[in-house]
Amino acid sequence: NGFGRIGSLVLRATLDRKDVKVVAINDPFIEGEYMAYMFKYDSVHGRYEGDVQGDKHGITINGEQIKTLAMMDPTQIPWGEVGADYVVESTGVFTTVDKCQAHLKGGAKKVVISAPSADAPMFVMGVNADKYDPKQHTVVSNASCTTNCLAPLAKVVNDTFGIKEALMTTVHATTATQKTVDGPSKKDWRGGRGASANIIPSSTGAAKAVGKVIPELNGKLTGMAFRVPTQDVSVVDLTCILEKPAKYEDIMAALKAASEGPMKGILGYTEDDVVSSDFVSDPASSTVDAKAGIMLSPTFVKLVSWYDNEWG
């Protein structure tokens, strides 16, 4: 539900998998022909090379038709009729359990909110996904892109060395909520300034959200963001006071081991001289940059991890 940046890229990601089939897309503001155009041409992730067609009935990708719907009221979306068991709620509007009940009334069995939620259970892959109970959880949140980057990193460090306190800064690429030129933004004055002309300090709930998925870190971690004028890919700076003294090499060894073991495919690790554009379309939730981090003392360390905030 919703075919903006997230909805469009969720569709791209499903085409790489054989165990997921998209049967319908609901967006009241986008007709099938335009939807096909949006899907095929992407300024960040490049042109989709398969065959894409669109008309008033839906879009067809490589011969597979996907029905398009245009319901404003989510209770009117016939998910059951089109055979949709799972709904990705990616409008950014319906982010509570109560609001997502509308999808269940329409015949869906499960709803995944593609954003943080005030009351839906929040799950981050590699961190607390083992707590998911299919019998109990029908509406869940997949948290935010930044939480998905930060939480795996924080989990490994906390499990191995203990985190006494930590501050996070995300240097975050521009997103659709920002303005191309200066404009009114009553709730966030700085957020109303032109995205391409400024580095904009901003708030983020990502660090506090980590306390929801890693309860032992609740109250020990907070953070903020700098919005910067790049199209995509962001980076987390996690500065920690550790419970146990450690060498920087020991911390990197623990993170590398996790990236090759229990968090493989979720947490990445690199010792290359990388920059942000190297992570466009990277599916990892978080990639530790071993060369970018620094340590001041055995209990005071800054860790750096990259993420494609649209695709990871």
From Swiss-Prot:
Gene label: GapC
Catalytic activity as recorded in UniProt: D-glyceraldehyde 3-phosphate + phosphate + NAD(+) = (2R)-3-phospho-glyceroyl phosphate + NADH + H(+)
Localization: Cytoplasm
Amino-acid positions noted as binding D-glyceraldehyde 3-phosphate in the UniProt annotation, renumbered to this chain: S144, C145, T146, T175, T204, G205, R227
Its job: Key enzyme in glycolysis that catalyzes the first step of the pathway by converting D-glyceraldehyde 3-phosphate (G3P) into 3-phospho-D-glyceroyl phosphate. Essential for the maintenance of cellular ATP levels and carbohydrate metabolism.
Keyword Transferase attributed: no
Enzyme class: oxidoreductase
Site annotation Activates thiol group during catalysis: residues: H172
Organism: Scenedesmus vacuolatus
EC number: 1.2.1.12
Protein name per the record: Glyceraldehyde-3-phosphate dehydrogenase, cytosolic
UniProt-listed GO biological process terms: glucose metabolic process; glycolytic process
Pathway: Carbohydrate degradation; glycolysis; pyruvate from D-glyceraldehyde 3-phosphate: step 1/5
Annotated NAD(+) binding sites: R5, I6, D27, N309
Active site positions: C145 (nucleophile)
The keyword Cytoplasm appears for this protein: yes
InterPro entries: GlycerAld/Erythrose_P_DH (IPR020831), GlycerAld_3-P_DH_AS (IPR020830), GlycerAld_3-P_DH_cat (IPR020829), GlycerAld_3-P_DH_NAD(P)-bd (IPR020828), Glyceraldehyde-3-P_DH_1 (IPR006424), NAD(P)-bd_dom_sf (IPR036291)
Residue ranges of the TM segments: none
Induction, as annotated: Induced by sugar addition.
One cellular component (GO) term of this entry: cytosol
Recorded family membership: Belongs to the glyceraldehyde-3-phosphate dehydrogenase family.
SUPFAM superfamilies found in the cross-reference section: Glyceraldehyde-3-phosphate dehydrogenase-like, C-terminal domain, NAD(P)-binding Rossmann-fold domains
Miscellaneous comment: Algae contain three forms of GAPDH: two cytosolic forms which participate in glycolysis and one chloroplastic form which participates in photosynthesis. These three forms are encoded by distinct genes.
